[in-house]
From Swiss-Prot:
Positions carrying Phosphoserine: 242
Name of the featured protein: Calcium-dependent protein kinase 3
Residues annotated to bind Ca(2+) 1: 392, 394, 396, 403
Composition bias, Gly residues: 39-53
Length: 529
């Protein structure tokens, strides 16, 4: 998921004078009614200055339609380098200031993708909120916002220390105390946001990066694209967030800032066990598990973990948001405090193994689904093919979000805007903001087709180029390059996690198990000696 679903209420942003810190999902359907909280250029236009050197503008310059202030070419000030990451709307690049030579990150959002009024308001609000929260040790610093004829460019502090899970896995040794330290930094972000009238709404491990590779580097929250301003008592109805981390009240469309605590609690559960607390074969299954809300502390490694760790997880994942701890109460919990009771005894290696698998598995599965889609018979996909043709109104072979939004209701579909966003997010494998024919078929074909033996064997044969009966690292690398879906590190991780007999290759049995199973416990349990 990791996307937006609808804003029924967004409170007005606090006045700009309150910008000092006091210490402290799913998709985006938005109703046609009045939206508050991101009215236009006021905050955005006045607060986005570039780093190093002045930005001169004249009154004759044309105002950009997104930020509502004079347009400027970001490339006049910054030299663009390699791509750092890719999201639903934009691409993040490493850029260098031409005068100061300072390296920063630039999130570049093509304005052609911001066709819907609410998408434009989301970008404006992201800029407002990042300026509003600037200066906090654990929040990435927004240094400036530029708009030219083609894109909005957000210049941000460069985080070179890698993602949360990457750091944990690369260190090898890991303890409750390390998990407590990471969780404390995340909850400090939540506390700061809430005390300044901001709800994050998309807390997940991928949205936290380390500033540097230094051992004591701070952890930084990096993505505020779904965040909103709120006032005490405000309730929101839009379905936003990311599947594993979304709170039950968000799924029920009646929630407040307590939903951020739930998401942080899910991350803590993963930090301690390597797997999410609520699991399903697909998004619907995950949501069903969340709505049931049954926490299980009987499986490994929970019996070996401290009572304090389990107590905090329980209190952050209370089903009723009124019973959940606040961010301030979490920070005062004896287990998480800096001088607290969390043990520095290393956790079982199986925790790291499960964490690696949770991170790596989806990439190979998505590629295999695309291969299956390529090889389905005309009879099997005739209905889906006709649906794609009717959605692709300009006959260019791709379906945009706007084409989905306007086309699905015409097909008699009762699909909600939230589900349309979900379909786009799930289907758009290469992250270009549109769905091609194969991506569409891959995302919409029924699960029973995936589990048919002939389809699985066809997919396996696609990867196994030399018909040796194994998928090697070289063969996986070729496939991932074809679909633009990963780097050398991802390839090694996939081999390591799917290859249960540890011979450096993936055999057919291992491939089928990976495709059919959603339970991340299965492989690590087989690995135990």
């Amino acid at each position: 998921m990791g996307h937006r679903h609808s804003k029924s209420k967004s409170s007005d942003p606090p006045p700009s004078s309150s910008s000092s810190s006091s210490g402290n999902v799913v998709h985006h359907v938005k109703p046609a009614g009045e939206r508050r909280g991101s009215s236009g250029s006021g905050t955005v236009g006045s607060s986005g200055s570039g780093t190093g050197g002045s930005r001169s503008t004249t009154s004759t310059q044309q105002n950009g339609r997104i930020l509502g202030r004079p347009m400027e070419e970001v490339r006049r000030t910054y030299e663009f380098g390699r791509e750092l990451g890719r999201g639903q709307f934009g691409v993040t690049y490493l850029v260098t200031h031409k005068e100061t030579k300072q390296q920063v990150a630039c999130k570049s959002i093509p304005t052609r993708r911001l066709v819907h009024k609410d998408d434009i308001e989301d970008v404006r609000r992201e800029v407002q909120i990042m300026h509003h929260l600037s200066g906090h040790r654990n929040i990435v610093d927004l240094k400036g916002a530029y708009e030219d004829r083609h894109s909005v460019n957000l210049i941000m502090e460069l985080c070179e220390g890698g993602e949360l899970f990457d750091r944990i896995i690369s260190k090898g040794l890991y303890s409750e105390r390390a998990a407590a330290d990471l969780c404390r930094q995340m909850v400090m972000v939540v506390h700061s946001c809430h005390s300044m009238g901001v709800m994050h709404r998309d807390l997940k491990p991928e949205n936290f990066l380390f500033l540097s590779k230094d051992e004591n580097s701070p952890l930084k929250a990096t993505d505020f694209g779904l965040s909103v301003f709120f006032k005490p008592g405000d309730k929101f109805k839009d379905l936003v967030g990311s599947a594993y981390y979304v709170a039950p009240e968000v799924l029920k469309r009646n929630y407040g800032p307590e939903a951020d605590i739930w998401s942080a609690g899910v991350i803590l559960y993963i930090l301690l066990s390597g797997v999410p607390p609520f699991w399903g074969e697909n998004e619907t299954g995950i949501f069903d598990a969340i709505l049931q809300g049954q926490l299980d502390f009987s499986a490994d490694p929970w019996p070996a973990l401290s009572d304090g760790a389990k107590d905090l997880v329980r209190k952050m994942l209370k089903y009723d948001p009124k019973d959940r701890l606040t961010a301030a109460e979490v920070l005062n919990h004896p287990w998480i405090r800096e001088d607290g009771e969390a043990s520095d005894k290393p956790l079982d290696n199986a925790v790291l193994s499960r964490m690696k698998q949770f991170r790596a598995m989806n990439k190979l599965k998505k590629m295999a689904l695309k291969v299956i889609a390529e090889n389905l018979s005309e009879e099997e996909i005739i209905g889906l093919k006709e649906m794609f043709k009717s959605l692709d109104t300009d006959n260019n072979g791709i379906v945009t979000l706007e084409e989905l939004r306007t086309g699905l209701p015409k097909l008699g579909s009762k699909i909600s805007e939230a589900e349309i966003r979900q379909l786009m997010e799930a289907a758009d494998m290469d992250g270009d903001g549109s769905i091609d024919y194969l991506e569409f078929i891959s995302a919409t074909m029924h699960m029973n087709r995936i589990e048919r033996e002939d389809h699985l064997y066809t997919a396996f044969q696609f990867f196994d180029n030399d018909n040796s009966g194994y998928i090697t690292m070289e063969e996986l690398e070729l496939a991932m390059k074809k679909y633009n879906m990963g780097d050398d590190k991802s390839i090694k991780e996939i081999i390591a996690e799917v290859d249960t007999d540890r011979d450096g290759k993936i055999n057919y049995e291992e491939f089928v198990a990976m495709m059919k199973k959603g339970n991340p416990e299965l492989v690590p349990n087989r690995r135990r000696m």
